């Protein structure tokens, strides 16, 4: 949520800032702006709406300069407007700030600053920052920022410039993402890697309450006591092309079709036929695994749905009790945690605020934490005891696809890893599941090559206002993800229900023409699922069925059925969900929705 870019270098800042902000559009925003230093003055241009509005404004009134900060805003305090857009400045426009996060004590700070003679123009929490920095400024911008931050409560990633020190950008973060990039042509700050990939792949990850001083000549890092510190430079392996559409109409479609490779990459070196599973970034011992008495899987949104699949997998493979929690609920419910409790957190970005808070809460009371994330060096990765990366590559579309399927792969890997250490599955059983896993990339390609039925169903149902998704067991977990995908990008009301719950109330919603998507991939409950489908079709529902090859009977009771290749039942969610992703995509396209940037949503939810 919100995107920050800062630059100091040899080139014109305006074009670099706008380009960087365009690479952060996936994070969600409602306004945009830049502040650029030139001839000892700060020039600000900002406006409500899409980034193109800012581009047009800068074309009409160009701003020269080689140092500046830019921002895309997601409204939290104050409505979307030109006035509330960032950057925000102090009264005499000598200090400008961009901010991602929430200042929790801004009302107290605002009242205190007003008592000191400061005035406020916007409704935002951010505006207290430039005024605080101004209050503490005594000739050194870094010192003033450190003192100002000592008064602030909440989350923040900040980029700050001052006409009093026009050669630098000062930045700091706490609970909101911020990286630093370096190159021969200049140096950068940004909320995420794609913003600066066209210029550099050499980056630093910033920890909470570490301060950055960025100039055209270099970068310096400081502790919150103002002491200089050294940081490790990291090199990003993927390049800017990975964050481009590559000929696809939308990022989401590209990322759906990248899933076979993402699945293969996530298994590489971890799932090898005839060899034990070895996880290099996980140090948990066999004895510790044997002593685990309970696992909490904690996540938000799509990652939560992957966690629900993980519950089925780990309990079946490793026979360990698993509870799945929404992160924003977990941290407030006083969970029962012992020294033998394991927490697994899932977060694509590694910066999800609620997940990070839940992780820290669990660690503070003694739980060991394994993080599953797609971003190396992210806050979640740094805070956890052990890490299991999903090698999905950059995911730009707001609606997650390949991050979800690779999270499923990590659940299978962990389930087998625990089973291997607890001896709850024989070596033969583990090898058989691994053999099936190794076929998933090829079978995923097969699924994605047959899209005609789902396209046709989308074309015939996109005008409906409601859709229902049904499943039993692990299929119910997949149904939840399918319903979320549809509502995220098509704005159609969609809900998932367990098949056995139909007669306990939900069936009252079924009438002539109601659209239902029914998953029946699990062999042990397939016949029961077919019976559930009959319950809705006899009441006039229009049903798309999804089943594994070799299952009989569904084609007789649904309007259309899509078969996915047969593998171990536990692995079928990887294949069946791809048809649900395609359904959501094609329904959204039929409706003319903004597939990659749906309304009101942000890719990375970095505020609670």
UniProtKB/Swiss-Prot annotation:
The keyword Transferase applies. It comes from the Bacteria. It holds the Pfam family SIS. GO terms for cellular component: cytosol. It is found in: Cytoplasm. GO terms for molecular function: carbohydrate derivative binding; glutamine-fructose-6-phosphate transaminase (isomerizing) activity. Gene3D superfamilies: Glucose-6-phosphate isomerase like protein, domain 1 (3.40.50.10490), Glutamine Phosphoribosylpyrophosphate, subunit 1, domain 1 (3.60.20.10). The active site is at 2 (nucleophile), 603 (for fru-6p isomerization activity). It is an enzyme of class 2 (transferase). It catalyses: D-fructose 6-phosphate + L-glutamine = D-glucosamine 6-phosphate + L-glutamate. InterPro entries: GATase_2_dom (IPR017932), GFAT (IPR005855), GFAT_N (IPR047084), GlmS/AgaS_SIS (IPR035466), GlmS/FrlB_SIS (IPR035490), Ntn_hydrolases_N (IPR029055), SIS_dom (IPR001347), SIS_dom_sf (IPR046348). Residues 285-424, 453-598 form the SIS domain. The keyword Repeat applies. Homodimer. This is Glutamine--fructose-6-phosphate aminotransferase [isomerizing]. It comes from Clostridium acetobutylicum (strain ATCC 824 / DSM 792 / JCM 1419 / IAM 19013 / LMG 5710 / NBRC 13948 / NRRL B-527 / VKM B-1787 / 2291 / W). The gene is glmS.
